Amino acid sequence: MRLGAQFLPEKFDEYIASVRMAEQAGYEFAWLVDSQVLWEDVYVYLTHGLDSTERITFGTAVTNPLTRHATVTASFFATLAGLHPGRVALGIGRGDSSVRTMGLPPARTGQLEQYVRSLRPLLSAQTAKLDGADVRLRWLQQDPGVPIMMSGTGPRNLRLAGALADRVMLYVGVTPEAVQWAMRHVGEGARSAGRDPAELKVSILCAMHVSDDHEGAAAACRWAPAACANHIADLARNNPRHDMPEVMVRLLKAREAYDYYTGHLDSSAAHTAYLTTELIDDFAIAGPI
């Protein structure tokens, strides 16, 4: 098992100290949130994080097709990978707080697919078709080797990730029931594209807090199910005939209003108060090990 840690681009000095600590502790990935309204610029933090460490891989978890044009994303990640070979990954999703805070909906599956299909050639020193135009990064002479990770909660995006991504990030909780359900859809997508599902790299996004105090540890992880519930609600709204597992349905039924501005990814936010320890345990690793 390989471990990664997620970081918010804020409190710069604390961030640098934290990524160094993560590297020393053996973490292999440092994933940064891309949400330009709520936090500082992720590109700046990725760059300084890489400059301040020696081994750990840095990437977005996740960027999106709506606030970052494909050429901008490709140029940045190709540049960064040229400076730090083998230590850069590009995480992409449909967009959550980065777009909802501007009153916009997340990207549709078709938009996400087109974005990734455009990024592949751009990141490989090849020509991409963008809005009918042939576009390439003129300065890029060879493939810098930037793996693409795609996140997913619902079947469509999970299947898309299985078809296109180098790594899939599951955002469905940590129960065997939910993970197996998600992997079934990832596998379907992989096979539809002629890929072997067994060769895909898979990550699970969850909160983790190790402590002898189970209740206290769970309370520290409230942010994870509270945020995931927004994606589950979208899935239920866009696909009423969904087949999501019962653990996700339970969270959906308990879900209350969510305020991105006052406490996104914050376990102390008022909108996490409804979460019981049982619900949290479905979406986090909390307590003694």
Question: What spans do the regions from the language model cover?
Answer:
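N-terminal beta1-alpha1-beta2 module of alpha/beta enzyme domains
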Residues: 1-60, 146
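Active-site-adjacent beta->alpha loops and helix N-cap segments on the catalytic face
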Residues: 38-47, 174-190
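Conserved, mostly hydrophobic/aromatic
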Residues: 26, 49, 80, 119, ...
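Hydrophobic faces of well-ordered beta-strands that scaffold small-molecule active sites
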Residues: 3-7, 30-32, 57-61, 88-92, ...
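Short, acidic/polar
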Residues: 11-22, 73-76, 152-160, 289
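Acidic (Asp/Glu)-rich catalytic clusters
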Residues: 19-24, 46-57, 77-88, 162-163, ...
